[in-house]
């Protein structure tokens, strides 16, 4: 069909005759789309009270960076630390894990680049499009914790580049694309690619040390708790993790809900090229139905433990009110537009994927033990939402949540066996390879 002037004129006339749309036009052009379509009743239907409420700790702030997955993981440890050691507040250093993730991702990128990939291969174009970025997956975070440990924020504080990472990413990716050309040329010429790679990694390390600061290898840290008890630590970041967190991360698994035809339930999946630490923990997911997905999250919170989760946070999101609900905005009554795509359809057609990781810090259950709304701890600071916390309706969770991390002992024998199987490898651009 060609769009003719007669056809467009008809659209003009149809709009002009629609008094409702003309009224909506006046409201939206003055106040903005979402402000004009906001549903007031959605606030009253999603009050922040929950039958299971695990934390009221002050929230953290990732600022202008894509470190949500790190903040979410470290926040789960943080709550444990605050409760166990009776501190008023505490944060682990998100900048410390950021440094080592950037370093390891650079090495990971170089390893993929020196693989057997032709220049016209779409996979090479995919790698070069974004050699590294801030985002990541749970298993990638585990790989960093296991290799480098963690430190208190007071020991390795924020830098300009960790809080606002755009410049760092721009120039690190510029350097890595140049490194890719150098490495592939070295291979073509029969040179010592490993020796060249070591020199290039020194440049990367120097760049990160200058922009983020040199991370500590050993440190001293002391604090007093609410009972005025004095505690002191001297040692390495890995020793600090073992002493003050001590969680065996191999006891946790990533569970996803991806209802697309190419991903049968109760099977495990990984994604080509997705990772950070060469030789570290493999990114791996178990796909389950949504009802089971939610039951696993509930079971972990009933046991007193918060849940790392990944979602598409921009969908139906009211940031100022702290609401994630399917009825936040009324497009149907105002614009005669209805969004009817299924969760699978949105994944298949590029409308949705995981964009953000947060923490499930509570849930409201009805008399039958079914979830009605969820308490979400975000990492956008105290001015977003309700002192940094959000309320997600159960329907929103169904439609826009894709990943949780839960203890292995919550899985059935059949689920655990499915997880332990050799995973199906998904294409690099699969939506389940999206980085939070």
From Swiss-Prot:
Gene3D superfamilies on file: Cysteine proteinases
EC number, as in UniProt: 3.4.22.40
GO cellular component: cytoplasm
Cross-referenced Pfam families: Peptidase_C1_2
Keywords: Aminopeptidase, Hydrolase, Protease, Thiol protease
GO molecular function: cysteine-type aminopeptidase activity; cysteine-type endopeptidase activity
GO biological process entries: homocysteine catabolic process; proteolysis; response to toxic substance
InterPro entries in alphabetical order: Papain-like_cys_pep_sf, Pept_cys_AS, Pept_his_AS, Peptidase_C1B
Catalytic activity line of the entry: Inactivates bleomycin B2 (a cytotoxic glycometallopeptide) by hydrolysis of a carboxyamide bond of beta-aminoalanine, but also shows general aminopeptidase activity. The specificity varies somewhat with source, but amino acid arylamides of Met, Leu and Ala are preferred
Described purpose of this protein according to its UniProt entry: Hydrolyzes naphthylamide-substituted amino acids as well as di- and tripeptides in which the half-cystine residue is involved in a disulfide loop, notably in oxytocin and vasopressin. Also has a bleomycin hydrolase activity.
Self-association and partners: Homohexamer.
Family (UniProt): Belongs to the peptidase C1 family.
PANTHER family per the UniProt record, alphabetical: BLEOMYCIN HYDROLASE
Stated name of the protein: Aminopeptidase C
């Amino acid at each position: 069909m060609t769009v003719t002037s007669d056809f467009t004129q008809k659209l003009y006339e149809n709009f002009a005759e629609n008094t409702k749309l003309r009224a909506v036009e006046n409201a939206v052009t003055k106040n903005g789309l979402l402000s004009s379509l906001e549903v007031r009743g959605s606030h009253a239907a999603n009050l922040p009270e929950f039958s299971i409420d695990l934390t009221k700790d002050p929230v953290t702030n990732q600022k202008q960076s894509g470190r949500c997955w790190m903040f979410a993981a470290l926040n789960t440890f943080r709550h444990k630390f605050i409760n166990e050691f009776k501190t008023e507040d505490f944060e682990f250093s998100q900048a410390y894990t950021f440094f080592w993730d950037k370093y390891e991702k650079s090495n990971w990128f170089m390893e993929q680049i020196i693989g057997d990939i032709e220049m016209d291969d779409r996979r090479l174009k995919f790698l070069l499009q974004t050699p590294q970025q801030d985002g990541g997956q749970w298993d990638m975070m585990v790989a960093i914790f296991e290799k480098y440990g963690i430190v208190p924020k007071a020991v390795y504080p924020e830098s300009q580049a960790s809080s606002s990472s755009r410049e760092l990413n721009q120039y690190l990716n510029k350097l890595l694309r140049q490194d890719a050309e150098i490495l592939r040329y070295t291979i073509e010429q029969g040179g010592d690619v490993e020796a060249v790679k070591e020199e290039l990694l020194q440049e990367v390390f120097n760049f990160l040390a200058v922009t983020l600061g040199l991370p500590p290898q050993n440190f001293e840290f002391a604090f007093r708790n609410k009972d005025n008890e004095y505690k002191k630590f001297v040692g390495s970041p890995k020793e600090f993790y073992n002493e003050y967190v001590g969680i065996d991360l191999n006891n946790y698994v990533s569970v996803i809900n991806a209802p697309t035809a190419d991903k049968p339930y109760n099977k495990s999946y990984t994604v080509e090229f997705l990772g950070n630490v060469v030789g570290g923990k493999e990114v791996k997911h178990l796909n389950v139905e949504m009802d089971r997905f939610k039951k696993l999250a509930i079971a972990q919170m009933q046991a007193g433990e918060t849940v790392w989760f990944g979602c598409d946070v921009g969908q139906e999101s009211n940031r100022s009110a702290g609401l994630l609900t399917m009825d936040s905005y009324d497009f149907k009554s105002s614009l005669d537009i209805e969004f009817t795509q299924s969760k699978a359809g949105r994944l298949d057609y590029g409308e949705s994927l995981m964009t953000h990781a947060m923490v499930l810090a509570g849930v409201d259950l009805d008399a039958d033990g079914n979830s009605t709304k969820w308490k979400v701890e975000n990492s956008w600071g105290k001015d977003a939402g309700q002192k940094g916390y959000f309320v997600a309706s159960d329907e929103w969770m169904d439609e826009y949540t894709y990943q949780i991390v839960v203890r292995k002992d919550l899985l059935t024998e059949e689920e655990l066996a499915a997880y332990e199987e050799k995973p199906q490898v998904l294409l690099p651009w699969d939506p389940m390879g999206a980085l939070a």
